[in-house]
């Protein structure tokens, strides 16, 4: 063997040995179980799979098929586990084509999300999950609570969530959950879509743009604010307060409780039935409100080309259109 061949062979052996050591260390780290009530994922680009059930602790496996970025780092924080992807979410260029998410920097090429790191997490169903400053695609089983901030684009699906849900979407991210046992706070800045099952607590929805929210039944009071063309749809709902600036739409199957609506623009509200007490509407523009139930103690102010129709009215009525007194019952003048 020549001196050059020997050097090459020795170097190859050394590199192979280092790779074996590195792989062994990685496997050891990923095999560790953490005693954590909360998992926080931040500064992350990639995929997340969370398997929840009867697990006593939290374990994390990291695979990085594309090697585009460094592996995320794990750190214990009291009763929690922090996972830092080490990636800035600013200046991301993200799009979805044929169901495939592609992400890259504005000054560089895009890559399929499958080329970024994958986090596979096993945890108890009581897990409190936090996802912040992240662009990701993922799924989760049942959770204790969810605090989610999604940037640019992505999608996430979960099972039932026992307690509160806090969601902020900046861009075109999508979230789907099953039933929620606590309060829900949703903020969408862009075109994100949120689909929820039943909500046992109160609900607050804020949309700035063209985002859509669909919810089954809501037990508590709900507040909706739309600035733009966003749409919100409910099943059966308790008290409802709505503010629309633009062309947004709100629909519900039934509403039983206090009802208040303010429309500035061409927004529309349609509720098929229920009992609203009191019933208060103010329209400045061409928006319409249609209530197919019974409204009690009605106050209506219409300015512009807007229209309010109510199936039945009980109690007091204070109804004015462009400064003139109006009374309509059952959709007729």
Language model feature labels by segment:
Residues 1-24:
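Gram-negative bacterial Sec-dependent N-terminal signal peptides
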Residues 154, 171-173, 190-192, 209-211, ...:
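Periodic glycine anchor positions in long extracellular repeat architectures
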Residues 23-170, 174-188, 193-206, 214-216, ...:
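Acidic (Asp/Glu) and glycine-rich low-complexity loops/linkers
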Residues 266, 273, 284-333:
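Hydrophilic extracytoplasmic domains
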